[in-house]
Structure formats: C-alpha cells, structure tokens
Amino acid sequence: MDICSRNEKLAIRRPAILVALALLLCSCKSTPPESMVTPPAGSKPPATTQQSSQPMRGIWLATVSRLDWPPVSSVNISNPTSRARVQQQAMIDKLDHLQRLGINTVFFQVKPDGTALWPSKILPWSDLMTGKIGENPGYDPLQFMLDEAHKRGMKVHAWFNPYRVSVNTKPGTIRELNSTLSQQPASVYVQHRDWIRTSGDRFVLDPGIPEVQDWITSIVAEVVSRYPVDGVQFDDYFYTESPGSRLNDNETYRKYGGAFASKADWRRNNTQQLIAKVSHTIKSIKPEVEFGVSPAGVWRNRSHDPLGSDTRGAAAYDESYADTRRWVEQGLLDYIAPQIYWPFSRSAARYDVLAKWWADVVKPTRTRLYIGIAFYKVGEPSKIEPDWMINGGVPELKKQLDLNDALPEISGTILFREDYLNKPQTQQAVSYLQSRWGS
C-alpha cells in the first residue's frame, strides 16, 4: 500500500505437497524445501478461482506502525491477558463497524515487515502486539481475525509486504533486530545478513537473490497451508527506493544479471520470478485461495510506451520494476487491485482514464479487477485535489463508485484504509457508504 504504502472448498492435496509442507513447518530453519517454491519446468499458469456473484467491497487494515490495529495504547498494558483482551475487542469493534457498512472483505496485513502476526516457524513474532520482537502476544491474531470475520460472513485476504525487514534503520531498530539472535526463529536480519540491503531508509531483502524469493514464498506457503485464508495479497512494495536511499544491488546484478540487456530488465525479471513462484505455490496447496497484487495505479505512461495509459504518473514498471500488466496477461494473478488514488479532475492521472485502461487490460483475461481508492484523502484539504473537500468528498466518491459499477470488467472496490472510516472529516462519506453498501 501507499503508506508511511472463494469459494471455500476443500482442496485435494497431493501427497508430495503434504510431505513438503511437513518438512517446512517442522523445521526452524529459514530455508524452505526447494519443492515448495519452484514450479516444475514447463508448468502452466495456475487456474484462476471462480468469482463470487457479489461485488468486492473491501478495506485494507494496516498493522505496520499500528496504523489501523492494534491500538497504539495497548502495547503499554503490562498484563498480557488484559492486553490481548483490549486488542481483540478493538478488532471485534472494527469488524462490527465494517459489517454495518457493507464491507465484505478485509485485507489484513499479516507480514508488515520481517515479523509475523501468527506463530510462524520462519519469522519472529511482531513487536506490534507487545512492543518486543519475538514476544508471544498470548493469542494468534491471524486466527482471531479469521474466526471473527468468517462468523460475520466476511472474507479475509492475508496481506504481505514481501521484502521489507524494518520501517527504518535507526540504531534502536538495529538493536532490536540483533536481540533476536538467541530466539527461534530469529530475524532474517541476523540469520541472513548477506540478504539485507538498505533502500528507502528501510532494511529490505535483496529481490535479486534467488534464495530470497524462495524464502518469501515459503512464508506464504506456511500461511496458506495452516490457515483458512480466502486470499493472499502483495502490496506495491517491490523495489522501493527514495532519492537519498537507493538499493545497492550492484554485486547481486553482477552475479545473477549477465543474461539481461539492462539492470532494469533484470530487476523486473526478479519480481516476475517471485510472483510466479508464489502463484504456483498457492495453487499447488489450495487452488481455491485467491492470489492478487495491489500495485501503483499507473503501469506505464503512454509517453514512454504506446501501450501505457494517458497519464503522467510514477509508473510501477519503471519505478518499482513491476511489470504488472504482464502478470495479468500471463494468468499469474486471480485479481489485480491497482491503487488509483486520484480524482476525476487530476489531469496527470485521472481516475476514469486509469480505471478504463485497466478494464481494457483485464478484458481478454481471466484476471479480475478491483480498484483501490483513496479514502484517506476524503475531507483532506488539497490545492491540487480540491474534489475531496467538496460536500465532504461524497460527490467524488460517488463518481468513482458509479464508474466501478458501470464497467463490467471491474469486480469491486477496496478502500484505503480502515482507520480513516473513523476520522471526523470522513463522516459524510462514511454515511454515504452505509446508505449505498450497508444493510
């Protein structure tokens, strides 16, 4: 995400997959069995899941930096039982609110960085629950979310940030990561220091290292094999650089990039390989689990590529080295959810222009299209996007939802993000959503 960015059927699992999973889940090492993450040579793209007749009405629920959940104050509660109770009640209250609004799918951030919101054999516990990396919060947040959402008839997609290890590189963060050395599992920061790079003022994994791709895939496999998630989603954080903090992967490129005409092509191939591995792995474990990506709204601008959109925005292909259009065409995704975070009047990246462009991309494919919209902008003063302030942002929101409903290629909408449903400036828009979607 752009922050600080199924049908439930019993899958028929092959014995070989079960054996591989047993090896993976019983091991405390961070290196997965090769059979879990490498699709067989010449394998076909995975079959897509069947679409529900009900439109997607989704919400992103971010846990990184405790943006949406758990409550920031809960980490200060010293009694583990009381702390867990407060966090669980906060989740229940949120789901009740979402249900009243007509939200039917929650995209729950289970891997915000190099830690987990479930008892993983590969990642340490997230510090978001207790304030300390590796400390058991006394319950399983992912299972709790699944239980509570499913009893309300809502689906849950496990949202992963694939490469991020930390949200900053401060000395205190380094001390926390190093402190996990004696834990099991320890942070990837100390287990595989040679995989770690600095990019965008964060510690990240080097996407060009094949073992990194396999390791990330094993984490997804762990969740899909152990939990009744309805889907898996990767956000837009692939290669994430900032002007003052570029990813130094020159050595990795020299080692692995010899077959490519440029470093940019090599980087795009790295993200392509990860998406393909994850896609095939999910379908080999539970074919009914959806796999999707939520990239930046612009694939490429027409000024750089005749196939691109009539826009002038930061392009996923060129900035994040994510050829998202290709992933759709190759059938690697059940759905794609581009973040079209601009109003109709934003000439550099008009909402309607991008929504229609993506509709044309998915039209000849089996990939579904959900549109991510910028609910976080509703009611916020902006000189370049004043539309979000007019009548509480309701007219702009209505236009976007009307277009999504009018284009048959668009199968739903996802709002970014949950906590903005509770802000004073969005309440007119929330009331409108309830009248439009709610029961």
Curated annotation (Swiss-Prot):
A cellular component term, taken from the record's GO annotations: cell outer membrane
Record keywords, A-Z: Cell outer membrane, Cell wall biogenesis/degradation, Glycosidase, Hydrolase, Lipoprotein, Membrane, Palmitate, Signal
Protein's cellular compartments: Cell outer membrane
Record's bilayer topology term: Lipid-anchor
Keyword 4Fe-4S: no
Family matches, as InterPro entries: Divisome_Glycosyl_Hydrolase (IPR052177), GHL10 (IPR003790), Glycoside_hydrolase_SF (IPR017853)
Parts of the chain that traverse the membrane: none
GO molecular function, one term: hydrolase activity, acting on glycosyl bonds
Statement: the UniProt record of this protein carries the keyword Hydrolase: yes
Name of protein: Glycosyl hydrolase DigH
Organism: Escherichia coli O6:H1 (strain CFT073 / ATCC 700928 / UPEC)
Origin organism lineage: Bacteria, Pseudomonadati, Pseudomonadota, Gammaproteobacteria, Enterobacterales
